[in-house]
Amino acid sequence: MKASELKEKSVEELQQTQIELLEEQFKLRMKSASGQISKTHELGTVRRNIARVKTILREKQGN
């Protein structure tokens, strides 16, 4: 997920994307805790994507 793609989305779309990423992060954390995760790098990737979405949301909201 690139920042340029996120900048084109509306605030509502960004909020929906953030919710989806948080759900995915939760699922990956549960897999990690139970030892079922095979691609451990996905957890870090999702975390960085959440940070990207939050950054763009702040820019759009002017805070």
Curated annotation (Swiss-Prot):
One of its GO terms (molecular function) is structural constituent of ribosome. Gene3D superfamilies: 1.10.287.310. Keywords: Ribonucleoprotein, Ribosomal protein. One of its GO terms (cellular component) is cytosolic large ribosomal subunit. GO terms for biological process: translation. CDD domains: Ribosomal_L29_HIP. It holds the Pfam family Ribosomal_L29. Coiled coil: none annotated. The keyword Metal-binding does not apply. It comes from the Bacteria. The keyword Zinc does not apply. Belongs to the universal ribosomal protein uL29 family. This is Large ribosomal subunit protein uL29. The lineage of its organism: Bacteria, Pseudomonadati, Pseudomonadota, Gammaproteobacteria, Oceanospirillales.
